[in-house]
Amino acid sequence: RPAPFSSTTGAAFTARRPTPMSAAIVKKRYEKLEKDMEDDKNFYHFMIRAREDDRLIGKAMIHRIEWSNGNCAMRLGIGAESDRRKGFGAQALTMLLRFAFSELNMFRVTAYIPEYNEGALALFRKFGFVEEVRRRQALERDARRWDLLVWGLLKDEWAKQASP
């Protein structure tokens, strides 16, 4: 099993090697991201913060929006291993799905999950996502090849789970 994603090991969503960034560069990137979101309504980026101390613990994104088909993809990541398995991901996923299905009126949501991410697989399965595609050996991490799994959830499947 590969080393977990953290601020020191690099993002699980990118193939690029992590590079240290100054506070000024981080601020500049997020200002650009905010401007891009204003200009392009095909993605929404969210920061996940812990309520108790407002600490930044992760990020989430709805992207690849196909308005004509009602499809979108999502990403969700909790950075530090010490912040995982505390319910932050479930809370964020609940809000993301509500936003995608209720606010954006999407028909389906797709998530791309590396096979080594057992926590994410369990979380998305719990929320009713179904594995639809397995891209064999599509990822390389820690000198090993891993499958990339494509999971999907339809609006009516979500509505059945979301209603009491």
Model-derived regions, located:
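Acyl-donor (CoA/ACP) binding surface of acyl/acetyltransferases
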Residues: 1-9, 45, 49-164
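Conserved GNAT-fold acetyl-CoA-binding loop/helix
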Residues: 7-32
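Short, conserved alpha-helical segments within structured domains
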Residues: 18-22, 44, 116
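A short helix-loop-beta-strand connector motif used in the catalytic cores of GNAT acetyltransferases and
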Residues: 31-47
